[in-house]
Amino acid sequence: MYGPVLRADRALLSASREDISTRCHVDNTIATVHEVMLWHNPVLRRLISESAVSTKRIAVVGAGVNGVSIATACASLGHQVQLFDESTPFDQTSSASSRMLHGGIRYIEQGHIGLVREALIERDGWLRFAPNATRVERFYFPVYQGSKRGRWLLFAGTLIYQWLAGCFSVGPSQLHSSEDLKHVFPSLIPQGLCGGASYCDVVMEYEPLIQRLVDEARKQGVRIVENMRIERLYSDGRIDTADQTLEFDRVINAAGPWAAKLLEASDVDSGFTIDHVRGSHLIVQASFRHALVLQAPGERRIIFVIPLDPQHVLLGTTEQKHDISDPIVCTDAESAYLLEILNQHLSEPLAASAIVSSFAGVRPIVRPRDTAPGDISSASRDSEIEISDRLISVFGGKWTSARHLGGKVAALV
């Protein structure tokens, strides 16, 4: 059975890490931690029991991390699932992430505590699901004179982050002197360095992880249909391709940034709309022992610097409003912005020639249609699910919570 947690109860959340990791017998089968959580919930037990005698034909549109997770969760309940994508799995937004499986420490400052807590629980699930494609990394906040956030404030934030993780914590928060940081990062500018704070989080090995997800989907019986553009959705369970109409018991719109646009093209009313935010990253030739979280001077934004291997780091991300009809690329201005922030912290600035490559993706920020757009940096990355007869649409979400979202949608089928 697939593993997303719909909602772990208090008893399970308060159990020790060892207790939770213990494999248990459920109805004469061996269950993982997430299966135990699923079966511990009586509502889910009833839904799963009903699904065993009510197999449905399901179409999932969009093979990003949300679509793959939803398809896998549905197939694990015995449904016949076809997963359609205009290109190939993980070809768009899901391929352009910051390579982190995390609670989102910056969301604490914005007040999205529930989202952070949920994602931290799910982070543990990723470590168990793909131990060979995930790793724990320590992230350091260097603090300079004049920084928007002082080291004690940052340390307090990391402690809250660790506390929210509870028994799912992957390492302690730490307060650092300037000498500590100079030792770990000798390339940092020493003048004005006041010390900092650090915390632990999880980084994905992208290619092995997406292969693990695709393999799991196929193992559960999902039929993946690549290079198939879906032109139109219907509330009665039909979908139109370029040359035929297919009928299903349920259709799940998991088209990510294009979910709302697909509904509009299908003349299906929705109470939600999507704001599109482009996030760009650089892969830079540089060497760091651990990850850095840099405060953008004069802003409240933060930039991650994550080691990929001994010679390269991932630098990102930007946040720019994006017209979904425009090409999704990292602009020259974004490249210069990211490199400048890194260079403002280095004794020996990097030249533009150190940029090995760049990539960009568009994140869908969901909001009710009758509300005005807000600040994109503080907007929630939470998800919304909308049901219109046999059509289920999924808006928003983030990598870390995708398997949790998959379970929620599967329970609604």
Give the positions of each predicted feature.
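Dinucleotide-binding Rossmann-like beta1-alpha1 core, especially the glycine-rich loop
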Residues: 99-184, 302
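C-terminal catalytic lobe of FAD-dependent flavoproteins
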Residues: 272-276, 288, 296-311, 321-413
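N-terminal Rossmann-like FAD-binding beta1-loop-alpha1 element of flavoenzymes
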Residues: 57-82
